[in-house]
Amino acid sequence: MYTLRRTGVKGCIINYDKTSLIEGFDCINDFDKCNCLITNIECCPTDREISEIMDVEYCWIEGKELMRLLKKEDFQWIWGVFSVFPKNVTLDEVLKYDYPYADGYTGFWKSPISVQHPLAVSEIVAWDGMYILLIAENDESVNTFMKKNIFAKDLEEYNRELI
């Protein structure tokens, strides 16, 4: 099976109106060569193709195809967890675990930060239409996103301020 690599997980949070999901995915190395499981889907596309793809319990999609859809229409996401997997991880393997979720998940607000799905390397989360969270095993992805977005805040620091 897989060895879980959970050391060095880092996260950041940013107001939804200060960035886009595309910017988050652009910071994940080789995202176009990954697969993505989208769960807890609540979004408002007007494009028929996108609406039909997202009107499901979960969506398994190649990173390159997801980027094409997000560039086709910049629509609002209320809830959604985008779990990113290397190409060698299959949908059958992914579905052996519970679906990641955003609405009601308290793990975002606790330290240490972790990726929900044990086989995923990164997660981007649309949270309540207000925030986007980027959580990754690769600090570089989060650091790059934070450098590009001055409004992004380290998620562990954000959580400490809530206490």
Give the residues covered by each predicted segment.
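N-terminal leader/presequence regions that precede the main folded/catalytic core
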Residues: 5-8
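Acidic, proline/glycine-rich low-complexity IDRs
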Residues: 113-163
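Short, flexible beta-strand-to-coil junctions
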Residues: 32, 39-45, 85-87, 126-128, ...
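N-terminal interaction modules that seed assembly of large macromolecular complexes
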Residues: 12-70
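Surface-exposed, low-hydrophobicity interaction/linker segments
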Residues: 48-125
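Phenylalanine-focused residue identity feature
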Residues: 25, 31, 75, 82-85, ...
